[in-house]
A protein has these predicted regions:
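Aromatic- and carboxylate-enriched substrate-binding clefts and catalytic-loop regions
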Residues: 137, 141-290, 294, 307, ...
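Extended beta-strand/loop cores of jelly-roll/beta-sandwich
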Residues: 16, 429-596, 603-608, 699-720
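C-terminal beta-strand-rich structural cap/linker in extracellular carbohydrate-active enzymes
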Residues: 405-439
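Active-site-proximal substrate-binding groove within the catalytic cores of carbohydrate-active enzymes
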Residues: 47-59, 230-238, 243-378
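Beta-strand-rich binding/interaction modules
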Residues: 373-395
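Catalytic domains of carbohydrate-active enzymes, especially glycoside hydrolases
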Residues: 116-136, 203
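Functional-site microenvironments in short loops/helix caps that host divalent-cation chemistry
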Residues: 481, 548, 553-698, 705-710
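An acidic-aromatic substrate-binding cleft motif
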Residues: 53-109, 135-138, 472, 477-482
Length: 720
């Protein structure tokens, strides 16, 4: 304990040794006065950020802190001077895109639709500079495929991925993929994670790696990438826990605080060429995010499809994003200015500006944090005879009021709005200025306030299932489930999403998707397979129907030479997609059960938690497996103690089972039931089990190649 106290005391002294009146608060630095909310009486004049002396003192203090901090870091800016990574300094807008995004891939046509995806973003908010493609969570852990397996299981595998990346490059968009340090329970990749990531990026021609849950990606990633001859950039999700990591993490995300007076990015202050993408994925109103990004001259994570939950950027925010991004792109070289000055003095309360000086011209990004319009004189700047001033946000030249050595600039700002001012010295002709002003002038005709900022959930619909022909007699191998009243109660167990409207699924009788579901159903009689379809049963189908899917990647992955392994005849068939299962059912004159039919057959009418009762019984289920390979499920008849009240077997704990499919404009998903024997260890982020009969899994769908899983099979139903 004494040693620990000594270490703590020494560490405290080291931190305190770098003296500053304005120490960083995490990844952000407070403004002049060190406060983020004003004292309304005593500090009113300070919070106008006028031309008093405190701003200069604050700025000098921050400059000294930066100078000393870079010495302490042994700072080397080599990575920011590398020609092949200079693009990162213009990488302003980046969505995290689910691989299951329907605008990105068309499973019916079997092709990537990159143009459709990008055209939609161009139309809605002005387009993107890069995209983070997300093929892993939340589906990872349903079987033992690791993060790199799931990427390679995307349609077309490596060759298809390379063509898809080229499609993005053709549109000027860079491509990122993630790396997850927490994925330690699935298949062992057999090499360091940084090597696996670097090799995949080189194979497919990708541009960057996003470090999911990383607070700074270790230097080993940089080294491994360089060794492939295909260097990529690194972008940790969290702000680097050690400032030294800034030297090889050219980008990062910003999970920021949003007080009334904007905070300053510590990382950008230390290294102005470091790109931050401000991320606040669950925010429905993006105003704070966009104002903080614009004030700091950094980017934004335009994330809308959050694990299959749609959080669309509303029209007002989308238009603000279009204009913010356009101005940042037009003046990107100014936004990396070494001597940028946050909190440039302003003349109006609640208006905050940042100065970005360059050769012959200077840009100010301005935000109005007030809930009302602000007009008139806004900022006073040092004046040079012959200089011209432009309201870039509105596309107009400003005629200044000259006050001694200063120019006082007047312009209007909307409530919670934005401004951008450009000063141009005499003899300087900025590139494309006329076109830039013409574009922003056109946009300014539509005030942001005229656009809706209302958030709306995205409705879903269930994919209809055609009824079967009525059997003339009780079908062999099926159990008759009688008609009856059924109190259907089930909850989605998605790890994230709170209790949002739009989460989970929307049954035909509901007016919105939601996590919790309850409905009293009048069940018609039907038949359901006593056991899941086995390997032997599926082999009969293949032989009789000569079925072979067009997209056959991962199809019957455990089979060899057209048949299942010895001893697997009575095990449930797995590595079959929803399409494969439907094809079998159609051949057999059956269909897949609706989820509520599956639950009724498993639960009966007494609301029990498990098919056999209300207490967990290890004898009734397959033994759980916690290793990193996938040994295969138990035989379907191995656990008779697991029978349901109607005598249906193997409903829980052996394999997941397909039921209904749900679709909205951007995502398809399958409801899977029963849970499986496979339980990967080491992380809370793996696909959660749903052994209880009042819980279900939501499995995101993209294409058969990726959807097929080693623990996912099916059983069939038939109408009576």
């Amino acid at each position: 304990m004494k040693r620990l106290v000594g270490i703590f005391f020494t560490a405290t002294l080291v931190v305190a040794a770098q003296d500053t009146r304005y120490p960083p608060d995490g990844s952000q630095i407070p403004g002049p006065g060190g406060r983020s909310t004003p004292d309304w009486v005593e500090e009113l004049s300070e919070w106008q950020m006028a031309t008093g002396g405190e701003h200069e003192a604050w700025l000098n203090d921050l400059r000294q802190w930066r100078h000393e901090r870079l010495i302490r870091m042994g700072y080397d800016d080599t990575e920011y001077r590398r020609p092949e990574l200079l693009w990162t300094q213009r990488n302003f807008i980046q969505p995290q895109m689910m691989a299951e995004e329907r605008y990105f891939y068309d499973p019916a046509a079997g092709k990537y639709t990159v143009d459709r995806y990008l055209d939609d973003l161009d139309k809605r908010y002005g387009g993107i500079d890069s995209v983070l493609i997300w093929p892993v969570y939340p589906n990872i852990g349903i079987d033992n495929r690791n993060q790199w397996d799931l990427a390679r299981d995307l349609p077309g595998s490596v060759a298809g991925l390379r063509r898809m990346v080229e499609d993005f490059h053709r549109r000027g968009v860079r491509v990122f993929f993630p790396s997850m340090p927490w994925d330690t329970g699935t298949r062992d990749v057999g090499q360091p994670y940084w090597s696996a990531a670097a090799e995949l990026m080189a194979e497919i021609g990708s541009d960057g790696v996003n470090g999911d849950t990383f607070n700074g990606m270790p230097r080993a990633y940089r080294t491994a990438s360089d060794q492939t001859g295909h260097p990529v950039t690194f972008e940790p999700e969290g702000s680097p826990s050690a400032d030294e990591m800034l030297m090889w993490n050219n980008q990062s995300w910003g999970y920021w605080k949003y007080p009334f007076a904007p905070l300053v990015s510590k990382l950008k202050w230390l290294e102005p060429r470091h790109m931050i993408n401000v991320c606040d994925r669950w925010a429905r109103d993006k105003t704070d995010n966009l104002q903080a990004a614009f004030f700091n001259g950094v980017g934004y994570e335009s994330w809308e499809n959050i694990w299959g939950i749609w959080n669309q950027i509303a029209p007002r925010d989308a238009e603000a994003l279009r204009r913010v991004a356009y101005i940042e792109r037009q003046f990107a070289e100014l936004l990396v200015a070494r001597e940028w000055e946050p909190y440039a003095p302003t003349l109006q309360y609640g208006v905050f500006a940042t100065r970005f000086p360059g050769e012959g011209r200077t840009l100010w990004t301005v935000v109005n944090r007030n809930e009302y319009d602000v007009g008139g004189e806004q900022i006073q700047v040092r004046h040079v005879e012959g200089a011209r001033y432009y309201d870039v946000w509105s596309g107009a030249e400003i005629k200044p009021r000259i006050d001694g050595a200063g120019a006082v600039l007047s312009f209007a700002m909307e409530a919670k709005g934005f401004g951008a001012i450009l000063a141009v010295l005499p003899g300087v002709a900025p590139r494309n200025l006329d076109a830039t002003l013409a574009q922003t002038r056109q946009w300014a005709r539509v005030p942001l306030a005229s656009l809706s900022n209302e958030w709306k959930f995205l409705p879903q619909h269930i994919v209809e299932t055609a009824p079967t022909k009525l059997p003339s007699a009780s079908p062999p191998g099926m159990v008759h489930v009688p008609a009856g009243a059924f109190d259907f109660r089930v909850t989605g167990i998605e790890i994230e999403g709170f209790n949002w409207a739009g989460l989970d699924v929307q049954y035909p009788w509901e007016d919105a998707p939601r996590r919790g579901h309850h409905h009293l159903l009048t069940m018609k009689p039907f038949y359901i397979d006593r056991y899941p379809v086995t390997n032997a049963g599926f082999k009969k189908f293949l032989d009789a129907a000569q079925y072979h899917p067009q997209d056959d990647h991962n199809f019957l992955k455990d089979w060899r030479n057209g048949t299942y392994p010895d001893g697997w005849a009575n095990k449930p068939v797995t590595c079959v997609s929803l399409e494969d299962a439907r094809a079998y059912a159609a051949w057999a004159g059956k269909r897949l059960p609706h989820e509520w039919e599956w639950q009724y057959a498993a639960q009966g009418t007494d609301g029990r938690l498990y098919p056999w009762g209300n207490s967990w019984d290890e004898r009734a289920v397959a033994a759980p497996y916690k290793g990193r390979d996938l040994p295969g499920p138990a035989d379907v008849d191995a656990h008779p103690a697991g029978a349901s009240p109607f005598g249906v077997m193997d409903m829980t704990g052996n394999i997941w089972l397909w039921t209904d499919e749900f679709v909205d404009e951007h995502t398809r998903s399958g409801v899977v039931r029963g849970g499986s024997y496979y339980r990967p260890q080491g992380s809370m982020w793996y696909f959660p089990q749903a052994y209880k009969l009042n819980e279900h899994g939501k499995y995101l769908l993209m294409a058969p190649s990726k959807d097929r899983a080693g623990t996912l099979g099916f059983r069939c139903a038939m109408d009576e």
